[in-house]
């Protein structure tokens, strides 16, 4: 038995480089001619890049519940109807029309398909939309060199209601019986500088205690509607009161950016092994001896926002001096990527708060 990991040439940095050593894990390129037979003959398949979506849909038969679920989650309009969230308003808009938007309430403007927080903007009636449109154009030009149109749409945008509340992410799968198995829960605090939106995700005892029962209940109810088995997903929620409101459910980026591998470097739990073995980690046992103040952090070291990466380079040691306990360090070619590395850390609450104030411009220095 194996877990097949479907990757593409546009797979995000960090996803593969941080994978746990696991003999029963096999990486398959989405252009592999065997792809159709792999899907027909194997149950344990995880897709790790949104840019594979067209190939995956073409490979799966129309009647396949997995295909139906992927299409459903891809279309944010149908998805909202499915979860009966009529209060949540969402509509499409072309990039060129952004400056004409009439905004009454706080809203989120973002590309229809997006990645890495690119061009995600919180707007309200006071936003200077012409100025914002120019900023977005600049950001899209910069990031579209790394992502293709399958992953980052340049012209199609959506405007949706802004949901107040803390943000959480969950990596999970439905096992062979369709039961939800949660392999990690993260709090996603918003950093001081929103251009580094995905800088920090962390797990903690309190996060699990608060979110786990709500998530379990949500996923059980969801599968009464989508009826999938052996189906891994990455999900994002806002917590309002004691209700989880889904922001995104994405079966195309399980473990994307390497976030799903944090659980391995924190608790020695290999999410792919649990997927293969159809089981969930015993979280109450895992957290039994964990200090309440301990934060297991996935840290994305972004490139500087306003310094040219052709004339500046990251001072990695300066950044590392900010950390308490590094469990994993994985560096990238910052000239080709939007970040220069990812780190798995163990921090306390106080230092975590300090890390959220980071401006990566301060960690880039002139190439002499």
Q: Language-model segments: what does each one mean?
A:
Residues 1-70, 347, 354-368:
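ATP-binding N-terminal substructure of ATP-dependent carboxylate-amine bond-forming enzymes
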Residues 62-147:
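A conserved helix-loop-beta module that forms one wall/lid of the active-site cleft
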Residues 90, 126-164, 200, 221, ...:
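Conserved ATP-binding module of the ATP-grasp superfamily
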Residues 113-114, 162-166, 227-231, 334-335:
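A short catalytic or substrate-binding loop motif that flags glycine-/basic-rich loops and adjacent residues
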Residues 137-190, 234, 238-245:
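Phosphate-binding site of ATP-dependent enzymes
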Residues 161-164, 171-227, 250-279:
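ATP-dependent carboxylate/phosphate-activation module, predominantly the ATP-grasp catalytic core
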Residues 172, 223-258, 287-309:
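Conserved metal-phosphate-binding beta-hairpin within the catalytic cores
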Residues 276-368:
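Peripheral (often C-terminal) accessory segments that flank ATP-dependent C-N-forming ligase machineries
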């Amino acid at each position: 038995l194996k877990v097949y990991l479907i990757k593409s040439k546009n797979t995000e940095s960090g996803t593969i480089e941080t994978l746990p050593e696991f003999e029963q894990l096999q990486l398959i390129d989405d252009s592999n001619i065997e792809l159709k037979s792999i899907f027909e003959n194997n149950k344990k398949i995880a897709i790790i890049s949104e840019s594979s979506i067209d190939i995956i849909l073409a490979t799966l038969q129309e009647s396949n519940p997995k295909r139906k679920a992927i299409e459903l989650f891809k279309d944010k309009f149908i998805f909202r109807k499915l979860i009966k969230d009529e209060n949540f308003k969402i509509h499409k808009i072309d990039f060129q029309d952004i400056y004409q938007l009439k905004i009454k309430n706080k809203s989120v403007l973002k590309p229809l398909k997006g990645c890495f927080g690119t061009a995600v903007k919180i707007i309200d009636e006071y936003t200077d939309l012409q100025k914002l449109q120019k900023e977005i154009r600049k950001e899209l030009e910069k990031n579209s060199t790394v992502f293709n149109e399958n992953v980052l749409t340049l012209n199609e945008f959506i405007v949706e209601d802004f949901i107040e509340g803390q943000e959480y992410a969950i990596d999970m799968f439905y096992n062979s019986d369709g039961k939800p198995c949660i392999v990690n829960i993260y709090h996603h605090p918003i950093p001081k500088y929103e251009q580094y939106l995905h800088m920090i995700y962390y797990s903690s005892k309190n996060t699990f205690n608060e979110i786990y029962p709500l998530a379990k209940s949500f996923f059980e109810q969801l599968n009464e509607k989508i009826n999938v088995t052996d189906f891994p997903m990455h999900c994002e929620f806002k917590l309002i009161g004691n209700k989880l409101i889904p922001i995104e459910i994405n079966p195309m980026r399980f473990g994307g950016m390497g976030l799903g591998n944090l659980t391995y470097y924190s608790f020695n739990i290999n999410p792919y092994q649990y997927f293969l073995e159809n089981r969930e980690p015993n979280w109450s046992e895992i957290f039994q001896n964990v200090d309440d103040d301990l934060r297991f952090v996935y840290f994305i070291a972004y490139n500087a926002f306003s310094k040219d990466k052709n004339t500046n380079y990251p001072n990695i040691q300066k950044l590392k001096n900010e950390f308490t306990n590094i469990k994993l360090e994985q560096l990238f070619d910052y000239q080709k990527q939007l970040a220069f590395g990812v780190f798995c850390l163990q921090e306390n609450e106080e230092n975590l708060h300090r890390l959220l104030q980071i401006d990566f411009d301060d960690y880039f220095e002139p190439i002499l």
